[in-house]
Amino acid sequence: MQWQQRDALWLLAPTQAKGVIQFIGGSGLGATPQLSYRRLLEAMAQRGWLVQCWSYLPGFDHQLLAVQAWRGFRSQRQEQLPVLRLGHSMGCKLHLLAPDQGRGAQAEVLLSFNNFAADRSIPLLGELAPRLGVTSEFSPGPDETLRIINSQLPQRPRLLIRFRDDQLDQSRQLLRFLPGGEAFNELQQLGGDHLTPASAGLRQQWLGGLGDGPRQRELNRLAEAIEQWWQQRGD
């Protein structure tokens, strides 16, 4: 399998696809998802998924980014295949803000959901903005994002995954606002930290077998957790 680019999308297609993964990575990492998330996405492709990942540069208007991502995926839609939306960190937020409210997918998997304010996400902004007399916040901001999630999203299968050593994760807060709450949405905890999904495998590439280790095992468990949940979920 070889990565192919279609405008802002990077595609990885197995010989026979059983479904489509629409992936959005985190802020910064999402600019080159085919590199930053290579091992996870290739593991999913090896399990029979057609992987589509959207590349983007971070900005303050998250609603605009969400619309752009949705349009990008829509331009490459495979109507005969089921769709799983997969996001990491800020990518979770962008999927949840999609203009179709998730109706274009059968399910969503959200890794390390993050919904911090701009001054928390960009520490220097918190220091400079008061001095410059300006205020900058993501649109929508954290509170408005949760209100949109709670009031506009339909109830559908969603898997939230947090990592044991992740200090940035807000999955538990998200679970309280998702339609259906804990009764309908599942939260799993795996070993790792906030960057576990983004392990690119550079050590393995440079060092061969010496590069294998905890990161690879964490990624294998993550890919398997996603696959098992997809197979067991209720439609």
Residue ranges of predicted features:
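Alpha/beta-hydrolase active-site loop
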Residues: 59-80
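Catalytic histidine neighborhood in serine/cysteine hydrolases
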Residues: 181-206
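Conserved hydrolase catalytic core segment
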Residues: 97-107
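Short, surface-exposed "cap/lid" segments of acyl-processing enzymes
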Residues: 2-58
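Gly/Ala-rich beta-loop-alpha elbow adjacent to hydrolase catalytic centers
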Residues: 86-95
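Catalytic active-site module of serine/aspartate enzymes centered on a nucleophile-bearing elbow/loop
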Residues: 199-235
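The feature captures the conserved acid-bearing segment of alpha/beta-hydrolase catalytic domains
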Residues: 12-15, 107, 117-187
